[in-house]
């Protein structure tokens, strides 16, 4: 595996995840704002090629 090529591919994937996730969250908040003023999120990273990969991030965003 060539390290530089892998690094570029990984950065591209992470950029796509970040940009598309932000768009979806902003759309949700505009169209259906949570009544509690807090949006709880969970993001899971899995891979069909690596069944042991199960990385979960949970975060709450205050909308006030």
Across the structure, where does each feature detected by a protein language model lie?
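N-terminal intrinsically disordered, cationic/polar leader segments
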Residues: 2-8, 27-30, 34-64
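General helical structural elements
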Residues: 15, 26-27
